[in-house]
């Protein structure tokens, strides 16, 4: 899905999330002939040919299953300040348009029983039924969370996870990506994964994931050549690895592994958050 005209996006701010929401909404409105919205970055690369990707995901289309990772978010630093994302309203690109401004403290939920914020990755695979739920927001929950996350730092890593859990949508806690994260050192962790190289490309191929990231135009040249050759060959084991990775999703019960909804949670409370 290509959005025209192009829109300004500020890294870490709500315009990243909004662009994805607009994209899936346009898909819902424009065609009935699809089952999954797959959010990819320019540094992603498929590990299966398109026909095999379609076959694997097609096994779960009738169940309405989305593939999303997430955990309850405990970091308060993402919600302690209100973020003014200038990409939302500037008509022209400027030096300041990519900068966010801290303009005060937002109003947080009055109690933890109101709702739980979840954190995962932006790179999700969403079933059409869930995309339709976000686009229409029939109970106003998805729309209310859009308002909440518009002032949330790095909302793209939380919006879909949070809405999916509170909408009780079928899901499996795996976004089906291979990502090579650098080792975590004491008191420090990297925000970006290591590039895929010749050293770890075979690990990516054997992982059963549908996509790998991230690929660097220079560092990943060797890995890219290996993958391109691999995809051109008939390999029955390749499809089998992906099928085996997704096998636990057959029970459609994976959401309980990361959706810890408060016992006293009420959709009505979420609707009234901003009243």
Walk through the language-model features, giving the residues of each:
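ER/Golgi luminal nucleotide-sugar-dependent glycosyltransferases, focusing on the catalytic module
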Residues: 1-275
